[in-house]
């Protein structure tokens, strides 16, 4: 996670943006920028965290070709997971920034809300199916509940 957040911080500094806060929360760290960052700067900053994870995975795949490295798996999974367009992940904030550039703000917000709801519903149904029929653990159901609570509290 530290590499991921370092990617955000370094790109923010390179873009001339100041950090207003860094907080440890239930889903990891959150970094808030000052309001000087424009839509395009935010897109670069939001993309840089997952990009660092994906580049680290690629680097270790090339470096240790015959290895089943946990580091590779974690960074690849973490980078891709953060690109899921849920509001509290980089992907959700990225979707919001892109839509804000292309569409009126209220329409962009509605699209993001619908996207969050649909993704949560799909994940919830899939996790229930896996729990009932595939005999897997229920952690994804708890993630859905946690995400839903976060979304409700955020409104």
Predicted region positions:
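Hydrophobic transmembrane alpha-helices and their immediate loop junctions
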Residues: 1-155
